[in-house]
Amino acid sequence: GRGGASNYVRL
């Protein structure tokens, strides 16, 4: 989704 690092953390 939006945001680079934030998206990976949710994955």
Swiss-Prot record:
Residue positions, PTM Leucine amide: L11
GO terms of biological process kind: neuropeptide signaling pathway
Intrachain S-S bonds: none
Cell compartments where the protein resides: Secreted
Keywords: Amidation, Neuropeptide, Secreted
Annotated GO CC locations: extracellular region
Function: FMRFamides and FMRFamide-like peptides are neuropeptides.
Similarity comment text for this entry: Belongs to the FARP (FMRF amide related peptide) family.
Protein name: Extended FMRFamide-9
